[in-house]
Amino acid sequence: MKNLFIAVSVLLGWFAVIAQLVLYIINRTVSLTETLFRFFSYFTILSNILVALCFTAMLVKPKSAWGRIFTHSKVISGTVVYIIVVSAVYNLVLRQLWNPEGLQKIVDVILHSTIPMLFVAHWLFRVPKNELQWKNAFAWLLFPLLYIILVLIRGTFSDFYPYPFVDVTESGYNAVLINCAGLFIIFLVLSLLVIGTGKLISKYTGED
């Protein structure tokens, strides 16, 4: 049953990412190269790829060099933080900005709701949490920090920003930096909540 759950999650995860890429290419208004750069500029895509890699490693190569990385409890727990932020920001803030239909709507639901729920459920019931430490919260901030830096640098040259709250052209640097500071606070608080929850679960399940 565990392997079936993971296998379904692997299929759904990669299907959604690949389908979104195909749709993005089909509907592109710029060159293929620029389209690919833009596609991989979305935190949603990067986070879902991380989730798909974690699930894939669990299923096929848990003891390989790369498998040990993506099945490590700290990596999975950090990815839980990222995918929860993806789901929360999209469903609370961004969903109202467009109305996808057909395949795009299906992919949209999988990326922002289904995969996050599956991954969080797996973390809650299947991932050991006894190695989690409070300092992990700060390490997990490195990925979103690097992401924001690269998005802002590239946006300076391409004038493309994947999300309205990081759009310097529309809002200016002051507003964007305030938005980013708010996001980092959300990441930090959520990271601490994930670690705290993990410690409680570990304590009451006897992992310690």
What do these predicted ranges mean?
Residues 61-75, 127-135:
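Membrane-interface helix-boundary motifs at transmembrane edges
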